[in-house]
Amino acid sequence: MEVLPGTTVGIRVSDGVVLAAEKRVSYGLYLMSKSGKKVYRILDKMGMASAGLMADMQTLARIVEAEMRLYELDSNISPKVWTVAKLLSYILYERRLFPYYAEIVVGGLDEEGSHLYSLDPIGAIIEDDYVALGSGTQLAISIVESNYKKDMSLDEALSLALKSVYAAMKRDAASGDGVDVLVIGKSGTLEKTYPLSELQSVAV
């Protein structure tokens, strides 16, 4: 299967999860936009991020958010992170002959703790402590793998995610133009965009 454009990183620590993705939208050699959003908040303590085609990312995010909010209303309980990942797996596998061009990472907090899952375009699920997806994977994962510690803080995980995506942006032509992050912790959830000018001082 072809490598999907962009760079997305997810990191899990005991206190929560960090999802990060750069903002460049490219089709082949053409730069479509410098302000694409590839990180999505699904529920208060859950989110997803993706690499691939923007239309497919947005479609999947809308479907999952709608289904999970209906689940909350119908059952009066908050879904587990695994529930979100499994729903995405069903959706992706159902379209395996004409797949969505998206690799996805799902992360969040539930009553069992923090969780991080990666899914390929046809729905295989892998749970891990960290993951990198997209065309900048090799550059990003080398940074994460060299610096990740199970006992690191959420702030340290955020710094590592920014550093890894920024490293990919400097060498991968399909990645660039800033980073969106979703930080999901026990004390709350933070969504923030880091422009290039800020990244140069933060991702060190």
Curated annotation (Swiss-Prot):
Active site (record annotation): T7
Classification via Pfam families: Proteasome (PF00227)
A GO cellular component annotation in the UniProt record: proteasome core complex, beta-subunit complex
Subcellular locations according to the entry: Cytoplasm
Transmembrane regions: none
UniProt cross-references to Gene3D superfamilies, sorted A to Z: Glutamine Phosphoribosylpyrophosphate, subunit 1, domain 1
Stored InterPro entries: Ntn_hydrolases_N (IPR029055), Pept_T1A_Psome_bsu_arc (IPR019983), Pept_T1A_subB (IPR000243), Proteasome_bsu_CS (IPR016050), Proteasome_sua/b (IPR001353), Proteasome_suB-type (IPR023333)
Assembly with partners or alone: The 20S proteasome core is composed of 14 alpha and 14 beta subunits that assemble into four stacked heptameric rings, resulting in a barrel-shaped structure. The two inner rings, each composed of seven catalytic beta subunits, are sandwiched by two outer rings, each composed of seven alpha subunits. The catalytic chamber with the active sites is on the inside of the barrel. Has a gated structure, the ends of the cylinder being occluded by the N-termini of the alpha-subunits. Is capped at one or both ends by the proteasome regulatory ATPase, PAN.
Keywords, alphabetical: Autocatalytic cleavage, Cytoplasm, Hydrolase, Protease, Proteasome, Threonine protease, Zymogen
Activity control: The formation of the proteasomal ATPase PAN-20S proteasome complex, via the docking of the C-termini of PAN into the intersubunit pockets in the alpha-rings, triggers opening of the gate for substrate entry. Interconversion between the open-gate and close-gate conformations leads to a dynamic regulation of the 20S proteasome proteolysis activity.
Similarity annotation: Belongs to the peptidase T1B family.
Keyword NADP: no
Enzyme class: hydrolase
EC number annotated for this UniProt entry: 3.4.25.1
Protein name, entry field: Proteasome subunit beta 2
Domain of life of the organism encoding this protein: Archaea
Originating organism: Thermofilum pendens (strain DSM 2475 / Hrk 5)
The keyword Electron transport belongs to this UniProt entry's keyword annotation: no
GO MF entry, a single one: threonine-type endopeptidase activity
Main localization, broad class: cytoplasm
GO annotation terms (biological process): proteasomal protein catabolic process
Function noted in UniProt: Component of the proteasome core, a large protease complex with broad specificity involved in protein degradation.
Name of the gene encoding the protein in the UniProt record: psmB2
Reaction it catalyzes: Cleavage of peptide bonds with very broad specificity
